[in-house]
Amino acid sequence: LGILCKKDGMSYEAFRNHWLNVHAVLCCKLPKMRRYSVNFVDRARFPKFGYDGFSELWFDSEADLEAAFKSPEGQTLLADLPNFTSVISPIIAVETQVMWP
């Protein structure tokens, strides 16, 4: 997971636009990534929530994740972060399926 705050002075719309139309395109080029999703905080319902959104990047292993970020595509992706976010809190989690359709 990557939990993000928009860049200081950037509108929420510009943040959302950059993430979806620039950063997500770069992210989808990561080698061995199986799934990617972007989730935005509903500002109408949670105007004071401390973050603006989070992403989920799915890999088969932590080794695949590390290799992806060390790749040229990963380095390009990381270099784009300051263009739209001031804070990113990365979390590595392992999914435990409790109920799955």
Please tell me what each predicted stretch does.
Residues 1-101:
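Macromolecular interaction modules
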